Amino acid sequence: MSTNDNWYIEHFQPTGSAIGFRISGKLDEVQSLFQKIEIYQTTDWGKLMLIDGAVMLTSRDNFFYHEMISHPALFTHPTPKRVVIIGGGDCGTLREVLKHPGVESATQCDIDEQVTRMSEKYFPELCDSNHDARAELLFDDGVAYMANCPAGSVDIVIVDSTDPVGPAEGLFNKAFYESCFKALKDDGLLVQQSESPLALLDLIKEMRTEMGKAGFQSFKTLPFPQPCYPTGWWSVTMASKQAKADFAFRQGAAQAKGFETLYYTAHLHTGVLVAPPFVAKALGE
């Protein structure tokens, strides 16, 4: 990470590359109990949030991530009513989940309250649903929350975390996935951000292996553009308890959705289920 000549530059060692944003000023900085959160004003990308020097989101392109970690799973599950979000402190995923009228409750559990408070202040458009009667915001350890979640009580678990280091490290292992497996109903789905398929396919393979050890039987990794993240290409991985699940989705419902999205569509969902050949080969699909 470096800041010079009015540019913020994040270096990405796995690919020997970097991504940068021209900035006009620093708006805020908070050192929480867990991490350093910074907010910058950019010249072209709106506001920029960093956590421990890594880009988390910008005003301009966060919709790619928030829509793709939410809507594919919600339209794949037959009747998603109870959703748990682990992480997601910026509240963008919660907003997308609660666009679905059939969702009866959505609990967001993020260990760091300061992420949410900074988002409320600088990204208020992401926090539109924070006071929805169906929303519950908890500031606690997501690993402990899932370990204590009643068996068979959840339809979808969304793991919207930072990279698998620091506070998020415990969200990428067999023990955590076992807790998710236990909490999910038989037709439940786990969906987790799974980094860049261009640079970190080995990490995606490891995640899927650990999910399998925890009992999940079928997996689907969905790539999508994310310009503000290293390589500009990101992914989420869905896991099902069902053997040989094809991850078919409720296409009619997706086409007739009564809410606006900026990236996700039913046609796009159909296409993203077909992995690029190099991804399919690496993941054994």
UniProtKB/Swiss-Prot annotation:
**InterPro entries associated with the record:** PABS, PABS_CS, SAM-dependent_MTases_sf, Spermi_synthase, Spermidine_synt_N, Spermidine_synt_N_sf
Keyword Ubl conjugation recorded: no
> Quick one: a GO cellular component term?
cytosol
Q: Which reaction does it catalyse?
A: S-adenosyl 3-(methylsulfanyl)propylamine + putrescine = S-methyl-5'-thioadenosine + spermidine + H(+)
Q: Which domain of life is it from?
A: Bacteria
Fetch the HAMAP family from UniProt: Spermidine_synth
Q: How does it assemble?
A: Homodimer or homotetramer.
User: Residues in the active site?
Assistant: 160 (proton acceptor)
The record's subcellular location field reads:
Cytoplasm
Chief location bin: cytoplasm
Instruction: Spell out the protein name for this chain.
Output: Polyamine aminopropyltransferase
Q: Which gene encodes it?
A: speE
**Positions with a binding annotation for spermidine:** 66, 90, 160-163
The residues that hold S-methyl-5'-thioadenosine are: 35, 110, 141-142, 167
Please cite one Gene Ontology biological process associated with this protein. spermidine biosynthetic process
Q: List the Gene Ontology MF annotations in alphabetical order.
A: spermidine synthase activity
Fetch the NCBIfam families from UniProt.
Answer: PRK00811.1 (NF002010), speE (TIGR00417)
The record's keywords, sorted A to Z, are:
Cytoplasm, Polyamine biosynthesis, Spermidine biosynthesis, Transferase
